[in-house]
Design a protein with these regions (language model features):
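P-loop NTP-binding core
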Residues: 1-256
Length: 256
């Protein structure tokens, strides 16, 4: 049975989508069968994996409204070992369209469960907000991975996110756990990055991944080319760090 990991942080610009794309790609590169579920209406994970988000017939939006099956929503073999359930701006309307729908928080849970046995990992990219879509993603997931940018306001809003995770666990998904925290955009040249890492480690009781994702120009360039970092620049610091993170994620599952 595949592990379902939601990548979430309502604070934008923390490397959430970058992590969703590149962790997924590096898991696939390591021989894991991966499904990427893009639940962000911006659709940046979809386009960052080379899929034209404005030219797909079925997206998460159609799936949630019952207009297509989960199999019809999946684009297969976007990369070796990697499939995608795409998203685009239409998904922004789901919040209103699903008002009054019974058990709407469980829609993704029910649909993903139909195919989870086909995969080793299902990576769910959440929107940068604590919305119905985020709740849907968490209700469908086993764990939540939280990227935190190495900057002054790193912990801003994190307590609210953890509160939401605990609320979903209490009311909707009793098996939901924290996968852990991963530091992103680390700049070894600055004292601030080091201070942020030390501060978070001192104040956060959650699991923290050893791998730290550096601030890397090649990571920033890759999405505009529609490929993950391990394909865009296989030997870059960004590619190596996401390979290490993927290895940690794989072995954490084996250790449990």
């Amino acid at each position: 049975m595949g592990r379902i990991i939601a990548v979430a942080n309502q604070k934008g610009g923390v490397g959430k989508t970058t992590t969703s794309i590149n962790l997924s790609a590096c898991l696939a590169e390591a021989g894991q069968k991966v499904l990427v579920v893009d639940v962000d209406p911006q659709g940046n994970t979809t386009s960052g994996l080379g899929v034209d988000k404005n030219n797909v017939e079925n997206t998460i939006y159609e799936l949630m409204l019952g207009e297509c099956t989960v199999e019809e929503c999946i684009i297969t073999n976007v990369l070796d070992n990697l499939d995608v359930m795409p998203s685009n701006v239409n998904l922004a309307g789901a919040e209103i369209d699903l008002i009054g729908v019974d058990e709407r928080e469980y829609i993704l849970h029910k649909e993903i469960n139909k195919v989870r046995d086909n995969y080793d990992f299902v990576i769910v990219d959440c929107p940068p907000s604590l919305s119905m879509l985020t709740v849907n993603a968490m209700t469908a997931s086993d764990t939540v991975l939280v990227p935190i940018q190495c900057e002054y306001y790193a912990l801003e809003g994190l307590s609210q996110l953890i509160h939401t995770i605990n609320l979903v666990k209490k009311r909707l998904n009793p098996d939901l756990e924290m996968e852990g925290v991963v530091f992103t955009m680390y700049d070894a040249r600055t004292n601030l990055s080091l201070q942020v890492v030390e501060n978070v480690k001192e104040n956060l009781k959650q699991t923290i991944y050893k791998t730290i994702i550096p601030r890397n120009i090649r990571l920033a360039e890759a999405p505009s080319h529609g490929v993950p970092i391990n394909i865009y620049d296989s030997k870059s610091a960004g590619a190596e760090s996401y390979r290490l993170l993927a290895d940690e994620v794989i072995h954490r599952g084996e250790d449990e």
